[in-house]
Amino acid sequence: GLDLKACFQYLDLLRRLMRRGTSVVLVTHHIHEIPPEVTRVVLLKKGRVVADGKKEDVMTGETLSALFGTRIHLVRSNGYYQALPGRKQV
């Protein structure tokens, strides 16, 4: 993992490349590293595609909970996503 400063520099570089029209294939387990400019997301589990489509359609708490096998509460802010522990149903 990168420290926060290095992570922000990395994201800034990715965003600049994408704004210039460069295609970027990003492979990560860290959803907070997905830049706002990303339009398509492919989710894999054990080498198989479990979801593929527009970022806003694929990046849901329900989809990520199924993918990672744990409840996830997904938060979106300024085009970025963050996974938080999901709440148990009462």
Q: Which residues fall in each region the model found?
A:
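ABC ATPase "signature
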Residues: 52-53
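Helical segment within the ABC ATPase nucleotide-binding domain
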Residues: 8-20
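ABC ATPase nucleotide-binding domains
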Residues: 68-90
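Conserved catalytic/dimer-interface elements of ABC ATPase nucleotide-binding domains
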Residues: 42
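A short, surface-exposed alpha-helical micro-motif characterized by mixed small hydrophobic
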Residues: 34-36
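H-loop/switch region of ABC-family ATPase nucleotide-binding domains
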Residues: 28-29
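Helix N-cap at the start of a conserved alpha-helix in ABC-type nucleotide-binding domains
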Residues: 4-6
